[in-house]
Amino acid sequence: EDFVTSAGAAVGRVDAFNDEYDGTRQDRIRYDTPSFGGFKVSVSHANDDRNDYALRYGGSFSGVKVKGAIGYGQNEANTQRNVTKGSIGVLLPMGLSFQFAAGERDLDAAAGRNDPSMQYYRIGYRFKGSELGETRLAASYHDAEDFSANGDELQIISVAVVQIIEPLGAELYAGYSNLDLETTATANIEDIDIVTVGLRVNF
């Protein structure tokens, strides 16, 4: 999807102003340690001297489930691709959940450039509203800064609902997202609105 101005001029693709630090899809060698007290360490090596390191945790306390991870991605061939990232999620017994994620790219080799960064916040609630199955509600806020240039900021607000249909082994879902971009180089950029509706059936 592309951003455009109110006059219809192209500004750029959404992914030019955002990065969720999902990593690359390359052949790699990876080792995961056994779990110790809920903690696990992962190390991997891929082509072009790419190395990834991660510490993960999963556990529960008095019915409260917690999952978290922190990682560092190192690219010896391109130091501008070194990334630090982390996330944590908490699910309470009554069905309320919270998630937070953040990441930053190291641009040491780029003089005068701010390090691009992102933050993600999400709140959710799940309950058994009918005989069909569990209903899940969620709202999230995503903020990405300085990815294309210093001072650029992309904000994404999303809401979603998922209805589990247990007799069919299916999920009915709907969502809405608003993407708002502010840049130092271009004014009057139009928001992007996305509506998603679908049905997923598990076989």
Please give the residue ranges for each predicted region:
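Flexible, solvent-exposed loop segments that connect beta-strands
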Residues: 3-16, 107-113, 147-151, 182-188
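Short secondary-structure boundary/capping elements
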Residues: 22-23, 80, 153, 191
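Detector for outer-membrane/organellar transmembrane beta-barrel domains
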Residues: 53-164
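Flexible, glycine-rich linker and terminal segments associated
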Residues: 134-138, 171, 201-203
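C-terminal closing repeat unit and adjoining cap/tail of repeat-based domains
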Residues: 158-181
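Outer-membrane beta-barrel "beta-signal"
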Residues: 191-203
